[in-house]
Amino acid sequence: MNWVEFSSDAFIAAFFLYCFGFMFYVIAVAGKKWSNRDPERHVKRWARIAYIVSALGLLAHLTFFFTRWIGSGQIPTSNMYEFMTFLGMAIMIAFIIVNAIYRKPVLGMFSLPLVVLIVAYASVFPQEVQPLVPALNSIWLKIHVTTAALGEAFFAVAFASGLMYLLRVVDFKGTSKKARRAQRWVEFTLYVIVVIIAFIATVFVFRGMGYQASFTQELVNIDSRGVETTTVQEVDYGMPPIFKPYNSEVVEMESFLGLSKPLFETPSWMEGVNAGRKLNTIVWSILVGSLLYGLLRLV
């Protein structure tokens, strides 16, 4: 086993420790109302357990970071996978610092899910070590990316604190215009969070199923001199195609819940690399997220 493979194991360990830390914070906050319990003693005990488990998760995450650095020979912030893993680690560092100051278990109940979400989102991206472009092989990459992520991490903890505050002070039973406006914005924020969770879950589910669809897309480009060039490329989908690429034909498509062919074609004005696949991913995320949010509202 080389350093990069070992770092992947440490990353998985960090993810599960963060999940357990979150569950223990929930027990610390919600469990104080259980019968035959001293609420203050219960909160203190489980908050300490949650903090220790979360700190162990951070230790495993730091192990991932430095062992991947050793194995790759470069600081692991050079692609989206590495940056998002570093951002998750930075958020955890920020939480550890803020929690050491204020010692509020409810902050852990809101911050840990954010860390889990970022870490899970990182796993969506390719995990191979990629060599740095020579222009980026500079000390400024280490300084700029890491300090930017650390700054964003404290904003992330502030977001968790702000959301916690809003859920506490907004009057969800109020009928005034001001109360209804506050309710709508809080619900919109929660809806966006659920859609992001749905995106990550959908990617993992279809990836686990091994789903794949392929299209051949014909692209026509006219340069400044009026010369027309046509290129044909293959586009692969990891989710059932609700929207197929513009001006494309199906090469291979597995049926899913009766969906044996794309329902729509991506509009021609949507340009960019893999525009159709990105639109399809957004639509799936909104559909699944809306379903999850509707179920949560029913509960």
Segments from the language model and where they lie:
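Polytopic transmembrane helical bundles with strong interfacial aromatic enrichment
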Residues: 1-299
